[in-house]
Structure formats: structure tokens, C-alpha cells
């Protein structure tokens, strides 16, 4: 792929895009109720309120088994920082093990410890709530066909800080990791070379370069193509557009160097976050990005529209880092149809919208130039 030449042409791309239909979305299909079942233990009861079977994908929802951001935790009106992981999952060839099947009016319960992903050692009164989008497939299928939004009740909890402090953090650093990370920060190192072999270092550096060029091109396209911006971010509001452009420019700057920046990048995992289907993940509390083994199975840069590759995965993860752009992006939805179904306020704060927009600009250009 002649990437530089293609991106040079991208700056002139202003052709309007055809309208894309929304994926079906239902705001009343899934009900989520939170209850306290211990000092910092929360039980989520998820109920299918519809009249047909729901096959619900667990990734980055309140049903996710990984230490992802399932709830928002507030104390005195201020959100308690999240200390868990923000992963990007491999979304192709999904299998049944990653879905939860619920008949009509049936419920499933999922229990998790909020102290494992939040520092609650201060103790006292906290308010917990959950909101998100569940990708759904039809019964006996793993093809995502719709999305169900959910908003939970507000749960008020009185937390014993001493007990909360005794809960092990899900993404806790080992002494070795603490030392490596401290040295990297002291040297302002972007890629931690000790986490890489020759092949993974080359791939990661290549991904950084491609991420920088993609983000730059997407920033230009955001200002030049209002139809495309509306398609991916659900608005053409001037303030929202400026936020998106600023975030893409920040990602481009952060991606432009392998040995300086505000994030620390690991070619391999030593914290146990590379669970099944995780391509890469970010710890926003530490501005740290980790590539997983299957990241290196992705193509460096794909021509396939809305497919995943190394470059857009790196771009996706950088949007999760508050040092790159604040507020950092969340994982409200995955995949093109789900992302363009988000309301505008969430679309401009959703990491995959940025990755898809960057990929879509490049992919659409190939179609445009080859036709």
C-alpha cells in the first residue's frame, strides 16, 4: 500500500457520502438494576424486557468478565478515577462463548467488586450507576444486528475505606512493573524496549507512524466533509467538531514519536490484561498502552472498510489516555453499525468512532480513486 501517497490525496477528499442507515437501537429492551451485596460488591441484574430471545455480546458491557469500566462511581459529585483496563476486542468471527442468551423477561446476574477498579480507601458515601450499549444478535446467531441502550438505577453505598483498601486492584503493578514504568517515565520513553523483541518493536513503531498519518488525515477530513462527519459522529455541531479535530490532532502528535510523549507503550503484557480476544488495552489511570499477542496477527493497515488493523487499534487506544486528550474516550460501542447508532454526545466520546472514521476515510478513498 502506497500509504503516504494515498494520504496526500486524502486532503482533497470532499465528495459527499451516501446516507447510511442506523443499526436498530432500543432504549427499553434491556433493564439493569444495581444492588449492594457487600462493602464494595455490586450485583447487576440484567433483564430482557422484550418479547423475543436476546443474544447479548458481553464485551465492554456490565456483563464483561474483565476489569473494564462497568459503572461510574461518584463521591460528593466528583467521579472516582477508574483504575481498570480499557481493551479493544477482536470483533471478527465471534463465537457463542462471548454471548449471554436471555429469553423474554428472563434475567441474569453479574457480581463485581468496584474496589478492584476504583480507589475507595477514603471510605464514606458513594453513588454508583451504569449506562452503556449492549450489542445483540438473534437467537442461535453471533452476527450483531442491533444494539440495546441501558441506564441503571442509582445505587447509594456506604463504604468502609479500610476494607476497600484491602481489595487487590485488578490491574495492580508488580514491583518489577513499578520499576520498569518509573524508569520509562523518568526517561520520557514512549516504547518500553524491554517489553519488545525485534519483530514486535518493528510492528509497534510502524503502527505509530501509520496512526499518526491516519489521525492527521482524519482531522483534515473532519473539517472538509460534513456529510462524513455527520455519519460517524451524528452531529455537525461546531463545538463537537472542534473537539473531535483537537482529539485527532492530539493522537497524531502522540503517535509521531517512538521515544517521547505522554504515554508509555508496551509491546507485550506483564499485567494479565491480554484475555481472550483482547487486541490491546489501556490503563487510563497510568496513561499506559499494552499490545497483546493477537495484535500482531492484524494487518498493519487494512484497505477493508471498517475492519480492524494495527494502526487503528493504536489510534483507538491513544484516545483512551487522558494525557493525550481530556476527557479521554470511553468504550460505549464497537463496530460501525453500533457506533453510528450512538447519540451524538456519546459518539464524540467513543473510541471506536475515531478508529472507524480514520479507517473509513482511507477505505472510501480507495473506492473513490479506483472507481
UniProtKB/Swiss-Prot annotation:
Zn(2+) binds at residues 316, 320, 331. This is Neutral protease 2 homolog MGYG_03465. The keyword Signal applies. InterPro entries: Fungal_M35_metalloproteases, MetalloPept_cat_dom_sf, Peptidase_M35. The lineage of its organism: Eukaryota, Fungi, Dikarya, Ascomycota, Pezizomycotina. Residues 20-188 form a propeptide. The active site is at 317. Belongs to the peptidase M35 family. Residues 1-19 form the signal peptide. It catalyses: Preferential cleavage of bonds with hydrophobic residues in P1'. Also 3-Asn-|-Gln-4 and 8-Gly-|-Ser-9 bonds in insulin B chain. Keywords: Cleavage on pair of basic residues, Disulfide bond, Hydrolase, Metal-binding, Metalloprotease, Protease, Secreted, Signal, Virulence, Zinc, Zymogen. Gene3D superfamilies: 2.60.40.2970, Collagenase (Catalytic Domain).
Amino acid at each position: 500500500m502506497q500509504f503516504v501517497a494515498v494520504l496526500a490525496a486524502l486532503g482533497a477528499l470532499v465528495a459527499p457520502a451516501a446516507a447510511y442507515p442506523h443499526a436498530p437501537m432500543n432504549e427499553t429492551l434491556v433493564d439493569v438494576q444495581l444492588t449492594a451485596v457487600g462493602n464494595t460488591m455490586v450485583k447487576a441484574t440484567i433483564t430482557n424486557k422484550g418479547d423475543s430471545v436476546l443474544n447479548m455480546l458481553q464485551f465492554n458491557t456490565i456483563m464483561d468478565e474483565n476489569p473494564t469500566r462497568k459503572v461510574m462511581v461518584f463521591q460528593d459529585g466528583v467521579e472516582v478515577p477508574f483504575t481498570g483496563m480499557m481493551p479493544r476486542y477482536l470483533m471478527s468471527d465471534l463465537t457463542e462463548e462471548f454471548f449471554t442468551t436471555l429469553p423474554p423477561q428472563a434475567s441474569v446476574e453479574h457480581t463485581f467488586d468496584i474496589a478492584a477498579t476504583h480507589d475507595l480507601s477514603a471510605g464514606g458515601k458513594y453513588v454508583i450507576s451504569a449506562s452503556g450499549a449492549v450489542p445483540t444478535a438473534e437467537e442461535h446467531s453471533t452476527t450483531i444486528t442491533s444494539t440495546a441502550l441501558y441506564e441503571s438505577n442509582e445505587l447509594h453505598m456506604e463504604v468502609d475505606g479500610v476494607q476497600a483498601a484491602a481489595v487487590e486492584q485488578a490491574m495492580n503493578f508488580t514491583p518489577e512493573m513499578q520499576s520498569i514504568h518509573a524508569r520509562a517515565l523518568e526517561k520520557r520513553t514512549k516504547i518500553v524496549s524491554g517489553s519488545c523483541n525485534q519483530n514486535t518493536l518493528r510492528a509497534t513503531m510502524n503502527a505509530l507512524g501509520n496512526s499518526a498519518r491516519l489521525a492527521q488525515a482524519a482531522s483534515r477530513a473532519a473539517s472538509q466533509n460534513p456529510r462524513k462527519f455527520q455519519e460517524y459522529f451524528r452531529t455537525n455541531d461546531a463545538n463537537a467538531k472542534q473537539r473531535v479535530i483537537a482529539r485527532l490532532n492530539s493522537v497524531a502528535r502522540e503517535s509521531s514519536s517512538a521515544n517521547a510523549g505522554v504515554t508509555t507503550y508496551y509491546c507485550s503484557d506483564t499485567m494479565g490484561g491480554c484475555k481472550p480476544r483482547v487486541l490491546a488495552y489501556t490503563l487510563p489511570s497510568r496513561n499506559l498502552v499494552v499490545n497483546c499477542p493477537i495484535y500482531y496477527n492484524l494487518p498493519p493497515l487494512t484497505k477493508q472498510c471498517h475492519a480492524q488493523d494495527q494502526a487503528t487499534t493504536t489510534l483507538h487506544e491513544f484516545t483512551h489516555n487522558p494525557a493525550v486528550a481530556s476527557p479521554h474516550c470511553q468504550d460505549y460501542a464497537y463496530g460501525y453499525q453500533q457506533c453510528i447508532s450512538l447519540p451524538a454526545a456519546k459518539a464524540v466520546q467513543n473510541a471506536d468512532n475515531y478508529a472507524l472514521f480514520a479507517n473509513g476515510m482511507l477505505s472510501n478513498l480507495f473506492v473513490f480513486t479506483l472507481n
